[in-house]
A protein has these predicted regions:
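Glycine-rich, proline-tolerant flexible connector loops at the mouths of alpha/beta enzymes
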Residues: 76-96, 152-155
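Active-site acidic/histidine proton-transfer and metal-coordination neighborhood
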Residues: 13-22, 33-39, 66, 96-105, ...
């Protein structure tokens, strides 16, 4: 992605297509159905560009978020938006301006950097790479960078790996604080997505600028169950949460939303969709409305 011209990098801006009626667009977000002043009223719904947004260039992505009233986005790296660490200063300013000129918030950047590696060189490469994206997120107007733990390698004492991950996160937390960027640790990995393991990692990663990014995994339901596992890490939640489609599968999303409302969570609930609907715009708007209905239902229980 070298020597991008402005036209190549940012793509063509297109007019907003008339994909929804005015009634559809204002049915939830514009009317703000959350009960004002009640716990959970400051939570916001956004998109992770994992599958549904991976092939949208930046103008298309922002336009589609505006159309669906999904007004926050975490940009995954290595996707069509092209927001990567090798952007020059001018290109970074252009990305920032595109978001500033729209109602869509750039929540942050989603990377795949991980800190479980046995090889010191690979570990250091991922730490250094994450720092590059901290600088990038700062420059383009984001507020944080998502990273991963991401495993407990065979043949290495578990405590040693946990210590290594935690210390790496503390280093990034200190670095990110200088740039106003939160380090968001996705609950991810074959073994590290177990909440008791995440709790142990965060016992080491005690820097206040390092937060848990809840990831809505099946492992959340193991052992004593969702609420128990939720409570293990809730005091370390960062500003982002990842969910899947709210109406697909067996994950108890209403219970999860109830827990976030009860604790008066004020961050972003970000959809990291896995399906391949024919009409992603319609599906995205539907997920936003389902989220708002769940929040309203949770508030009514209080």
């Amino acid at each position: 992605m070298t020597d991008y011209s402005r036209r190549q990098f940012l793509g063509h801006s297109l007019g907003v297509a008339g994909l929804f009626t005015a009634t559809t667009l204002t049915s939830c977000s514009n009317l703000r159905i959350f009960a004002p002043g009640k716990p959970g009223s400051k939570m916001r719904f956004g998109l992770v560009t994992y599958l549904w947004g991976k092939d949208w260039d930046l103008p298309t992505l922002i336009r589609n978020c505006e159309t669906t009233k999904v007004l926050g986005v975490e940009l995954r790296t290595q996707h069509a938006h092209g927001v990567e660490s090798n952007l020059n200063a001018r290109q970074r300013r252009e990305v920032r301006k595109r978001f500033e000129d729209s109602p869509v918030t750039l929540v942050g950047l989603g990377t795949n950097f991980a800190f479980h590696h046995i090889e010191h060189e690979r570990l250091q490469k991922d730490i250094d790479g994450a720092k590059q994206y901290v600088r990038l997120s700062h420059d383009v107007g984001g507020s944080g960078v998502k990273v991963k733990p991401n495993d407990l390698p065979e043949g290495v004492p578990v405590e040693k790996t946990i210590e290594q991950i935690g210390k790496s996160l503390n280093e990034l937390g200190r670095f990110g604080a200088d740039y106003g960027q939160e380090i968001r640790v996705e609950v991810h990995g074959r073994k590290t997505q177990r909440l008791p393991i995440m709790k142990r990692i965060f016992d080491v990663a005690d820097h206040p600028n390092v937060g848990v990014c809840w990831n809505s995994n099946d492992e959340d339901l193991t052992g004593p169950g969702l609420e128990y596992n939720f409570n293990l890490v809730k005091n370390r939640f960062g500003d982002t949460v990842h969910i899947r489609e709210l109406n697909i599968g067996q994950y108890p999303y209403q219970q999860l939303i109830n827990l976030f409302v009860k604790m008066d969570y004020k961050g972003w609930i970000l959809l990291e969709a896995r399906t391949k609907p024919k009409d992603r715009i319609k599906a995205l708007a539907e997920q936003r409305m389902l989220f708002e209905q769940m929040v309203a239902k949770a508030q009514a229980r209080l």
